[in-house]
Every structure is written in structure tokens, then in C-alpha cells.
């Protein structure tokens, strides 16, 4: 199977209910954070019983941004066999453009993480 399941966890409540993200982590770091992207990628893989999972959390706008977390800030998490990578991104444009950029970046990160993992497993980290 290529796609086993997906979770849409827009609200903090759904992040807690569907993915079991702890309330104290959400309160400490906020929903748009490296820590939450990491927890989402970790938990999604466990719940789906899969080797690869991807998470995104961000502010697509047009509202919701702050000076510390502006519109366009996105964290993308990728979990490949328990190895989790999180990338911070800053995208420009309207809500639709930010969402499109997020999907493109998430797929690129997933590809990079899978290739890196299997390169290390197969070739000991050396390119063949």
C-alpha cells in the first residue's frame, strides 16, 4: 500500500483527540512549532502502522499570523522508520499559494528523507 491513512487535525482539540498530542506540549510551544510537527509525524506513523509519515502545521492566512509566527510559517515533519526530520519553511502568497507550496515542500522532504534513509541502510551512508 502506498497510502494507508490520513489525519486532518486543524484544531488543537483534534490534534489531542486524533493524534494524542499532549496538551502541555501544545500550550508550551503552540500548534505551529517544530515540536508539534515532530509529534504529529511520530504519532501518525505509530497509529497507521507505517514506515513513512508526513506532517504539516502552519499559518496559511490570511489571518492568524503574529510577529513571532507570521502568515506563511510552516513546519513540515517527516518520519521514516522512526527517524524524524522537521523543516521550517516560510512561504509567500495568498492562502492557496501557501498551501500549494506546503504540499510541494512536504513531498520533496519526504522524498529526500526516504532516499537518505535507504542510502544509509543500503550503502552505509555512501553513494553508490
Write out the residue ranges for each language-model feature.
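Short alpha-helical segments enriched in small residues
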Residues: 1-128
Amino acid at each position: 500500500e502506498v497510502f494507508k491513512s490520513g489525519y486532518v487535525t486543524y484544531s488543537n482539540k483534534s490534534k489531542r483527540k486524533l493524534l494524542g498530542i499532549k496538551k502541555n506540549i501544545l500550550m508550551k510551544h503552540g500548534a505551529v512549532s517544530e515540536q508539534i510537527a515532530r509529534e504529529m509525524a511520530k504519532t501518525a506513523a505509530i497509529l497507521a502502522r507505517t514506515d513513512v509519515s508526513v506532517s504539516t502545521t502552519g499559518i496559511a492566512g490570511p489571518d492568524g499570523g503574529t510577529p513571532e509566527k507570521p502568515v506563511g510559517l510552516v513546519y513540515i515533519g517527516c518520519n521514516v522508520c522512526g527517524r524524524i526530520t522537521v523543516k521550517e519553511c516560510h512561504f509567500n502568497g495568498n492562502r492557496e499559494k501557501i498551501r500549494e507550496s506546503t504540499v510541494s515542500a512536504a513531498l520533496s522532504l519526504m522524498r529526500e528523507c526516504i532516499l537518505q534513509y535507504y542510502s544509509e541502510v543500503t550503502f552505509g551512508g555512501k553513494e553508490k
